[in-house]
């Protein structure tokens, strides 16, 4: 899979002028189970798919302040799926998607995998992406927070790498319907590292992921979070939608509660799963292709050991061997701890994504 970049602006808005048979190609490749799930959970109806898409497209004229750089059927469809085919909500998300990019132009300049900042973040494992999906068909993303080397990667570049990864993944219509899971392992994440997570950059991430991207997140799982991450979470809660807050789960070092929501057979051994330890270079190799092996010397003796030699266009430097920190989670008896004390600990919100 090659690097992804923002598409050039369309000269003219697309209009639908085909028949139903032409439109149903948008569901091509979906399993019968996923098509039925889209019908039941997302209100997706192939008989009126063209009408739903066109209704969203017709709203573009109401926001002349925004440059809608892409308006084809497949692109608009992912926003409809993200908002359960409520056309007004889908258009609002579409507008926020492009407005976020207008307001943060520097973030999306050279927005592709071989951009030096994005490339470094990908090589350092931001994000990790598991090859297989969970039992609900959701893609699992991993963030090992302690591996953030602040001398190598800015928070913004890590965010750019995550957004670019989501752009690549969301091309899969199965994931548009089934969604994503994010697991953040805070093992060995120091107070000094946490001090760099200012409210302004956290707000930037929330706006980019929660408010401006057409992905369905079924859950955000914190593992091994220290007390100061709880404090940071308190700071960002006002920026989170109620739906988002209900889907954030704080597991501490008790993996049994995580396994209640994500079965161990879909998790690497770092999280008490039955899969092998996660290879931090897997996703970077997928996005960078030949560029990965040409410019970087990776030696994986295990998840713990990663040696990186990086050469940039402006500066040659050799990084000292970097120890990738392992999760300190344990599997022990316990129950799920939701972020809201006293709140019903029903897992249903994770099954019926909004």
UniProtKB/Swiss-Prot annotation:
Membrane topology, as annotated: Peripheral membrane protein
Comp. bias regions, Polar residues: 345-354
Chief place of localization: Golgi
Domain CRAL-TRIO residues, every copy: 118-279
Keywords: Cytoplasmic vesicle, Endosome, Golgi apparatus, Lipid-binding, Membrane
The keyword Transport is assigned to this record: no
Basic and acidic residues: compositionally biased ranges: 335-344
Pfam assignment, any one: CRAL_TRIO_N
Free-text function comment from the UniProt entry: Required for normal morphology of late endosomes and/or lysosomes in neurons. Binds phosphatidylinositol 3,5-bisphosphate (PtdIns(3,5)P2).
PANTHER family assigned to the protein according to its UniProt record, in alphabetical order: ALPHA-TOCOPHEROL TRANSFER PROTEIN-RELATED, CLAVESIN-1
The protein's assembly and partners: Forms a complex with clathrin heavy chain and gamma-adaptin.
Identification of the protein by name: Clavesin-1
Taxonomic source organism: Pongo abelii
Gene this protein is translated from: CLVS1
């Amino acid at each position: 899979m090659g690097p992804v970049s923002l598409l050039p602006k369309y000269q003219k808005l697309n209009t639908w002028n085909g028949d139903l048979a032409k439109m149903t190609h948008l569901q091509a490749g979906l399993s019968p189970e996923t098509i039925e799930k889209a019908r039941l959970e997302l209100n997706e109806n192939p008989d009126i798919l063209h009408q739903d898409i066109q209704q969203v497209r017709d709203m573009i004229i109401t926001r002349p302040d925004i440059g809608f750089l892409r308006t084809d059927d497949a692109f608009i469809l992912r926003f409809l799926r993200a908002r359960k085919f409520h056309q007004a909500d889908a258009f609002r998300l579409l507008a926020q998607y492009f407005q976020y990019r207008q307001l943060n132009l520097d973030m999306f300049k050279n927005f592709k995998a071989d951009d030096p900042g994005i490339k470094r973040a990908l090589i350092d494992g931001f994000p990790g992406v598991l090859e297989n999906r969970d039992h609900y068909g959701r893609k699992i993303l991993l963030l090992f927070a302690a591996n953030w080397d602040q001398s190598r990667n800015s928070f913004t570049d890590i965010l750019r790498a995550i957004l670019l990864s989501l752009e690549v993944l969301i091309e899969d219509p199965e994931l548009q319907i089934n969604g994503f899971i994010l697991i953040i392992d805070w093992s060995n994440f120091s107070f000094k590292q946490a001090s760099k997570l200012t409210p302004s950059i956290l707000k930037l991430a929330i706006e980019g992921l929660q408010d401006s991207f057409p992905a369905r997140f079924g859950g955000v799982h914190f593992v091994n979070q220290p007390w100061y991450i709880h404090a940071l979470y308190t700071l960002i809660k006002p920026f989170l939608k109620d739906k988002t807050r209900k889907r954030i789960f704080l597991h501490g070092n008790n993996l049994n509660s995580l396994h209640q929501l994500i079965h161990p057979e879909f998790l690497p051994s770092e999280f008490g799963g039955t899969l092998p330890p996660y290879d931090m270079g897997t996703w970077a190799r997928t996005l960078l292709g030949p560029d990965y092996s040409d410019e970087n010397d990776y030696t994986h003796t295990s998840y713990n050991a990663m040696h990186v030699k990086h050469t940039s266009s402006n500066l040659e430097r050799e990084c000292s061997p970097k120890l990738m920190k392992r999760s300190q989670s344990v599997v022990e008896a316990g129950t799920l701890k939701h972020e809201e004390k006293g709140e019903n600990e029903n897992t249903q919100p994770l099954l019926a994504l909004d």
